[in-house]
């Protein structure tokens, strides 16, 4: 059984927390995030620590307990440190460029694919084959990174495509010539 819900979240210095019932808001040096949580979990803030307690022992409440704790931990980390995803592009002629608020990808199609960058994200293209996506909301960063990767997922045969920098690809062998 998971014990995620019982973890105590430390609040770093320079981070402000405001709790109003089931509404949770956190402000830090990188920005602010707020979220409305379930009324079946109780969020407590004391001595620069946040703890989450469930109000009953029903199965849905137990499930929300750990989820709420993890979401709050991600919010606190996001406004203090931020989140970052790095992608790399492999393949001849595959490249990325920034054009205003759009990320343009040449990924082997007859046309370039243009993706609108969400307003709370920062996207950098240090080299045409590297993309760095950063922001304070872990969900938005991960969603946009998955959207970029989904334009041309890496091929298991050739390895060409867009992949996360730390992703290990499982390669397959090609067809054998018949005798």
From Swiss-Prot:
<dbReference type="GO" id="GO:0003735">
    <property type="term" value="F:structural constituent of ribosome"/>
</dbReference>
<keyword id="KW-0687">Ribonucleoprotein</keyword>
<dbReference type="GO" id="GO:0002181">
    <property type="term" value="P:cytoplasmic translation"/>
</dbReference>
<comment type="subunit">
    <text>Part of the 50S ribosomal subunit.</text>
</comment>
<protein>
    <recommendedName>
        <fullName>Large ribosomal subunit protein uL6</fullName>
    </recommendedName>
</protein>
<dbReference type="InterPro" id="IPR020040">
    <property type="entry name" value="Ribosomal_uL6_a/b-dom"/>
</dbReference>
<dbReference type="GO" id="GO:0022625">
    <property type="term" value="C:cytosolic large ribosomal subunit"/>
</dbReference>
<comment type="function">
    <text>This protein binds to the 23S rRNA, and is important in its secondary structure. It is located near the subunit interface in the base of the L7/L12 stalk, and near the tRNA binding site of the peptidyltransferase center.</text>
</comment>
<comment type="similarity">
    <text>Belongs to the universal ribosomal protein uL6 family.</text>
</comment>
<keyword id="KW-0694">RNA-binding</keyword>
<dbReference type="InterPro" id="IPR019906">
    <property type="entry name" value="Ribosomal_uL6_bac-type"/>
</dbReference>
<keyword id="KW-0699">rRNA-binding</keyword>
<dbReference type="GO" id="GO:0019843">
    <property type="term" value="F:rRNA binding"/>
</dbReference>
<dbReference type="Pfam" id="PF00347">
    <property type="entry name" value="Ribosomal_L6"/>
</dbReference>
<dbReference type="InterPro" id="IPR000702">
    <property type="entry name" value="Ribosomal_uL6-like"/>
</dbReference>
<dbReference type="InterPro" id="IPR036789">
    <property type="entry name" value="Ribosomal_uL6-like_a/b-dom_sf"/>
</dbReference>
<keyword id="KW-0689">Ribosomal protein</keyword>
